[in-house]
From Swiss-Prot:
<dbReference type="InterPro" id="IPR037245">
    <property type="entry name" value="FIP-RBD_C_sf"/>
</dbReference>
<dbReference type="GO" id="GO:0005509">
    <property type="term" value="F:calcium ion binding"/>
</dbReference>
<feature type="domain" description="EF-hand 2">
    <location>
        <begin position="50"/>
        <end position="85"/>
    </location>
</feature>
<dbReference type="GO" id="GO:0055038">
    <property type="term" value="C:recycling endosome membrane"/>
</dbReference>
<comment type="function">
    <text>Acts as a regulator of endocytic traffic by participating in membrane delivery. Required for the abscission step in cytokinesis, possibly by acting as an 'address tag' delivering recycling endosome membranes to the cleavage furrow during late cytokinesis.</text>
</comment>
<keyword id="KW-0132">Cell division</keyword>
<dbReference type="GO" id="GO:0032154">
    <property type="term" value="C:cleavage furrow"/>
</dbReference>
<feature type="binding site">
    <location>
        <position position="69"/>
    </location>
    <ligand>
        <name>Ca(2+) 2</name>
    </ligand>
</feature>
<keyword id="KW-0968">Cytoplasmic vesicle</keyword>
<dbReference type="InterPro" id="IPR051977">
    <property type="entry name" value="Rab11-interacting_regulator"/>
</dbReference>
<dbReference type="GO" id="GO:0030139">
    <property type="term" value="C:endocytic vesicle"/>
</dbReference>
<dbReference type="Pfam" id="PF09457">
    <property type="entry name" value="RBD-FIP"/>
</dbReference>
<feature type="binding site">
    <location>
        <position position="32"/>
    </location>
    <ligand>
        <name>Ca(2+) 1</name>
    </ligand>
</feature>
<dbReference type="GO" id="GO:0032465">
    <property type="term" value="P:regulation of cytokinesis"/>
</dbReference>
<dbReference type="GO" id="GO:0030496">
    <property type="term" value="C:midbody"/>
</dbReference>
<feature type="binding site">
    <location>
        <position position="34"/>
    </location>
    <ligand>
        <name>Ca(2+) 1</name>
    </ligand>
</feature>
<dbReference type="GO" id="GO:0042803">
    <property type="term" value="F:protein homodimerization activity"/>
</dbReference>
Length: 633
């Protein structure tokens, strides 16, 4: 089973270890212990160890549905999908959602990979590289720690027997399946050149130090962290995991000649962006190796490696061998690796040259298109200048026409404003005159209203008095009518009585004459006495009736006098009202036409009432006492 392949976690033991460590990382990120990691909390933790864009990309891969939180199943799904184990995730975890981009290329050593294999992890997963470093830090495993474990295994492989060599290789495969499975295939490949590029063929001491240069950094000073160097915390963890033993002096490793020749070529200036990224990554690896060598002066070999060396030496001495043969074999294997790496780099340079030629053709095509576009731009610029010239001419003509129109309108508006100003001044003068007349008319109206109110009050008083006098006149007329009827009845009764007395007197006279003629009547003395007594009674009755008649006449005269006096008083009041009305003639000049017409109607009504009243008085006098109207000398 190859290291770094997706089938590595398929072993139940490896799968359990892998999921257990993923669970430890998930629990470390789950601060609330509710079974979910908030994306904000995850990004905040990631910003402490990586750049913001990389952390955001990683969070987007772990939370593809943008739910705002990451469950353990999604967490495992994202990590395994980044490792290229999407099919394995669907089979084991039962995840059915759409997974991020994955890598299914089988694992091959760095020096034996094809260009297509390298382009995947080196170019397409740059953000995943930093994201995987974040997960490795959470799990306590960093790049430096992995390099230390890898170099420790190399020491065991070179200084042990063939049987121990096989066992160590199996143990390394277990580590790759369990611990190294947190990385993408490309990221695991990035670690191998660091170990292999440090070998040299100069001396045996340099070979030993190059083999052990990634195992432990000793007690030297901490180096500054940079994107191309391991984190100091990872170095401290490596120091804690390794046992302190005897130190072995280190020597600087050598970068392959073919790579350095490629870096110094003049063709780097015309490489495309994809090639520049590849070369930058190689330069970064070389800088990291140099930085590790420069900042680790006191590297120590681990106690395990030192024990293996002693055991290997004892086995070799017992078998009449020497360590130099082992060193020679190791050097041969390293030379083979370097040769393979150089051949791979030559192949890569050839591909880059082909890409450069292709890019040259594309560049020529783009130049021709650019020339065509430049000519087109020049034509459009000429057209634009012509349009600008025409537009300026049209603008000048329109501006001139608008200025003339504006001046004409300004003159017309000026003349209109002068006329309107004169009209406004005239209206203001008329308004002032009207205000003066209005004030005078208001005062005159107030005075007329007061006079009218006084006349109206007097008219109401006169009307009340006239009504009272009319009532009194009606009562007196009723009483006079009753007296006339009573007097008429008494007069008729008196006339009847007188007629009766006359008839009786005539009858008595006739009876007396007959008695005297016949001589047969009663005695004359008695008859005369009866006649005399009867005459006396009649005379008394006549006097009484005369007195009553005289009294009635006196009462009638009194009533006529009262009626006349009342009529005269009413006439005087009407004449006084007419006089007062005539006193208003002085105000005719200041009164309006409507007021004059109303006053004239009132005067005519008063005159009509006076005529009717005079006619009534004359008729009453003619009926009751015509002697009043007689003209006496």
């Amino acid at each position: 089973m190859e290291r770094g392949s997706c089938s590595a976690p398929g072993d139940p033991g490896h799968l359990g270890l892998f999921l257990q460590r993923l669970r430890q990382v998930f629990d470390a990120c789950d601060g609330d212990a509710d079974g979910f990691i908030k994306v904000e909390h995850f990004v905040a933790l990631g910003l402490q160890f990586a750049q913001g864009d990389e952390v955001k990309k990683l969070a987007k891969r772990l939370d593809p549905n943008a739910q705002g939180r990451i469950g353990f199943k999604d967490f495992c799904h994202g990590v395994l999908a980044m490792k290229g184990c999407d099919k394995f995730v669907k089979g084991i975890l039962g995840v059915t959602g759409t997974a991020p981009q994955h890598y299914e290329a089988p694992y091959t050593p760095y020096y034996y990979q094809s260009p297509e294999t390298i382009e995947g992890p080196f170019l397409d997963t740059e953000s995943s590289y930093s994201d995987s470093e974040f997960f490795a830090y959470e799990d306590g495993l960093t790049l430096s720690h992995r390099d230390a474990q890898h170099e420790s295994d190399l020491d065991s492989a070179m200084y042990s027997t063939p049987s121990s060599e096989a066992s160590d290789e199996g143990r390394n495969e277990d580590k790759a399946g369990g611990l190294g499975s947190l990385y993408l295939p490309g990221e695991q490949n990035l670690l191998k050149p660091s170990a292999g590029s440090g070998f040299s063929t100069h001396s045996t001491a340099s070979l030993i130090s190059n083999e052990e240069q990634f195992e432990d950094y000793g007690e030297g000073e901490d180096i500054d962290y940079s994107p191309g160097s391991p984190c100091p915390d990872d170095e401290s963890r490596t120091n804690a995991l390794s046992d302190l033993g005897s130190s072995v002096p280190s020597s600087a490793g050598q970068t392959p000649r073919k790579a350095r020749l490629m870096y110094n070529t003049d063709l780097l200036d015309i490489y495309c962006t994809q090639c520049s990224k590849k070369i930058t990554l190689l330069n970064d690896l070389e800088a990291r190796l140099k930085n590790l060598k420069a900042n680790s002066p006191n590297r120590k070999i681990s106690s395990t490696a030192f024990g293996r060396q002693l055991l290997h030496n004892s086995n070799l001495s017992s078998s009449n061998g020497s360590t130099e043969d082992l060193f020679r074999d190791s050097i041969d294997s390293c030379e083979n690796d370097i040769t393979e790496k150089v051949s791979f780099l030559e192949k890569k340079v050839t591909e880059l040259e082909n890409d450069n030629l292709t890019n040259g053709d594309v560049k020529n095509k783009l130049k021709h298109e650019n020339i065509h576009l430049v000519h087109r731009v020049h034509e459009l610029e000429e057209f634009l200048r012509d349009q600008e010239t025409k537009s300026e001419q049209v603008l000048d003509e329109e501006s001139k026409r608008h200025r003339e129109t504006y001046s004409k309108l300004a003159r017309e508006k000026g003349t209109e404003i002068v006329l309107l100003s004169a009209r406004v001044q005239e209206l203001q003068e008329e308004n002032e005159d009207l205000l003066t007349s209005l004030t005078r008319l208001k005062s005159h109206t107030v005075r007329i209203d007061e006079e009218r109110q006084r006349v109206w009050d007097k008219l109401e008083d006169t009307s009340l008095r006239l009504k009272d006098e009319t009532d009194l006149y009606k009562r007196l007329m009723d009483k006079l009518r009753q007296n006339r009827l009573h007097f008429q009845k008494e007069r008729e009764a008196t006339q009847e009585l007188i007629e009766d007395l006359r008839r009786e007197l005539d009858h008595l006279q006739i009876y007396k004459l007959e008695c005297e003629r016949s001589g047969r009547g009663p005695p004359s003395g008695l008859t005369e006495l009866n006649v005399k007594s009867r005459e006396v009674e009649l005379e008394q009755e006549i006097r009484r009736l005369k007195q009553d008649n005289q009294k009635l006449r006196d009462q009638n005269d009194d009533l006529n006098g009262q009626i006349l006096s009342l009529s005269l008083y009413e006439a005087k009041s009407l004449f006084s009202t007419q006089t007062k009305a005539q006193s208003l003639a002085a105000e005719i000049d200041s009164a309006s036409k409507d007021e004059l017409m109303e006053a004239l109607k009132e005067q005519e009504e008063i005159n009509y009432r006076l005529r009717q009243y005079m006619d009534k008085i004359i008729l009453a006098i003619l009926d009751h006492n015509p002697s009043i109207l007689e003209i006496k000398n």
